Structure formats: C-alpha cells, structure tokens
Amino acid sequence: MTHSHSHSPASGPAPLGPIAAKIVVGLLAAIGVLVVIGAALLWPAQQKVEIPLPYQNSSGSAVTTEAGHVVSTRAAVCGDQSVGKVLTSEPARVQGDEGCVQSQIAIDSGPNQGAYTLVEFSGGPGQPNLAVGEHVRITRQIDPTGTTTYAFYDYERTWSLAALAAVFAVVVVAVARWRGLRALLGIVVAFVVLVVFLLPALRDGASAVPVSLVASAIILYAVIYLAHGVSLRTSAALLGTLTSLLLAAFLSWAAIELTHLTGLSQEDNNAVAAYLGNVSITGLLLAGFIIGSLGVLNDVTITQASAVFELAEHGGSRRSIFVGAMRVGSDHIASTVYTLVLAYAGSALPLLLLFSVAGRGLGDVLTVRTWPSRSPARRSAASHWRYRCR
C-alpha cells in the first residue's frame, strides 16, 4: 500500500488554465473577505467570567501555584495537623497507624520561599508517588484569617516538555528545512487563533458552528500558505480544504443529531455545563469535531493536490489524470482511516477495558454515548479535570 505524503504543493509550474486559475483565486479572495467579516462580527467581547470553583482560592480569585521540590517522603499517620502549613523545620513524627504517605516539600518560589510544607496522600491507586529531589508545583492559598496553606498541585513538567518540544522542532527543521520552520510557525499561529479568538468567543456564548468555521478558515489560510508557499497549487489545495471543512461541519452536525450525542457523558463537559452556563455543550462538542478534522483534511487535500498537479505536469488526458489521482487518493484514504480508528481506540483503552469486564456486547460498546464522542484530546482533558478535582 502506498501512502503518499508528498506535501510539496509549492514546487513546479501550475498546470491550471487561466480561467481555472482566476476562479480559484477569486473564490479564495471572496472566502477570505467573508472570513474577515465573520471574525469581526464574532470577535469576543472579553466578558469577565467567574473562575470555576475547583480553580478558586478561598477569596474567589485564581489559585496561585509555586515551585517546590521533595525533601523527604515517609509513611505517616493520616490527618497530621502540620499538613499544608508553612514550616521552618521537619515536623515531629506522630505515633499511630501509618496508613498514609507524607512528603516534605521545600518551597522554591513565592513569599514563603526557603520554608517547607507537608503534603499527604492516601497511597492508593492513582495517587502521586513523590521521590526525593523531584520538582513539583504546589498551590498557595490564604484563608480569611490570613493563614497561608499549601497543597500538591502537579508534577513540574516545564523543562521536560520544553526539551521534547525542542527535539521535535529540531527534527522538523533538520528534515524539512525552511518549510519545516514555516510549519512550526503555522502551529504557533493556530494556537494563537484558538486562544485569542475561538475559546473567548465560545466562552461568551457565541454559536459554535460559525465561530469554529471562521477560526478553522483563519488557521487554514495561515498554515497552508506558511508551510507550502503561495502558488496556484497551494491555492487549489486550500480551496479543496475549505470545501471539505464545510462538508465535515455538516456531517459532524448530522452525526450529533442522528446519534443524540449530548457530550454530558464526559466530566470536562459536565464541568463546563456547571460553571459556564452560557456555553452550549452540544455546540462545544460540534466545535471540537470541526477543529479536530482540520489536520486530517489538510493532510489529504494537500497530498491530493500535489498528486494531481504532478500527474498533470507529465501530460495525459483529464481522464487518465483523474484515474491516477483517485488511485493515489484511495490508498491515502484507506491508510488514513485505520490510522484514525487505531488512534481513536488507543485513546479509549481504559473505557474499552471497563466494557470488557462489564460483559457488555459489541453493539453496546459501539453505541453507548461515552464512546462515539470519545477522542484523544477530549479524553486527556477529562483526565486532567478529574485529577484536579480530587
């Protein structure tokens, strides 16, 4: 099976006739104007939103996190009164049944830098297992009496994630050179659009479909031209991607309506429903489907555009070009399908494991509402929220 990934639409002459070229450029210009108008109309009002309860401190403001590292870890009696307090030395050991695990954390930032605090865990499955020297993040809260308390928040991952991102960037640039660097810039642009436009607009209660379509179009215009250069070949690929995006949005809406998906089977969506009442959960689910389809659509349309233009440059009738392009496309679609399905199944392995021990039939597994709306990104977000709310 030949899975073509010749993503180089900017190279070579463009075998488009003058009329076809004018149509492509004209349509992209018109769509671009509509996207700009849509962004202006849907631009978020930056309304102040109350911080969700799990992320509030006792005064209702955002929880502050500080850096720390583990000094010692030991088995201890549960319910030690020193847990969470600011300490200047190691607390005395309490005698009794040592059913918990306590870790002394040195505070490395904030107003109590240089002091210590004590965190406690039950030691059960899923609880952190802190080793001496490990760097962590701890929350700092001040209660109404002015007393400062600390609690374990998460592992410190800044440097490890930065190192992985740096390795990824180096490999991309080393292999793809300037095109790889431009692709990385496209990723930055995509995240800026999501953070500056999409998320605030959804938070303001704007309709999910137009917001996600406008955001997706902005991302596509930026990343495709950045990564592949400005040419008629790239423009043809962009027009195909935008057309496919509309179809994907319609199919996503139809799937949600026909299968009666609500999104409320996932804890992150339930949290949004509880704390952001003006946000439509079904709309949020639909927006996730639309944004999630961008990568696949971009991959397929760019590859197909490259294949068609390469075939056209070598001559041949329109029929032979069409047949050859469809042959490449069928291989590409086939490999993309099982790639998506395997990624989908891999992200839902815990859910599949639970279904396997529950004695549920295959029909129940495939149609239960917690399964169709499952995706890697959404599962990760749900896991993150559950961990925070423990």
Regions found by a protein language model. Give the residues of each.
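Generic detector of multi-pass transmembrane helix bundles and their immediately adjacent loops
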Residues: A249, W253-S383
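Short, glycine/charged-enriched hinge/interface segments at domain edges or termini
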Residues: T147-A183
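Hydrophobic secretory-pathway targeting helix
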Residues: M1-V63
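Transmembrane alpha-helical segments that form the functional core of multipass membrane systems
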Residues: A166-V171, W178-A271, V279-G292
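Hydrophobic alpha-helical transmembrane segments
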Residues: C100-Q113, E134, Y155-L164, A183-V193, ...
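Alpha-helical transmembrane anchor segments
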Residues: Y221-V223, R378, A382-R390
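Extracytoplasmic/periplasmic regions of membrane proteins
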Residues: Q47-W159
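Alpha-helical transmembrane segments and their helix-start/interface "positive-inside/aromatic belt" motifs
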Residues: P18-L28, L232-L245, S335-T339
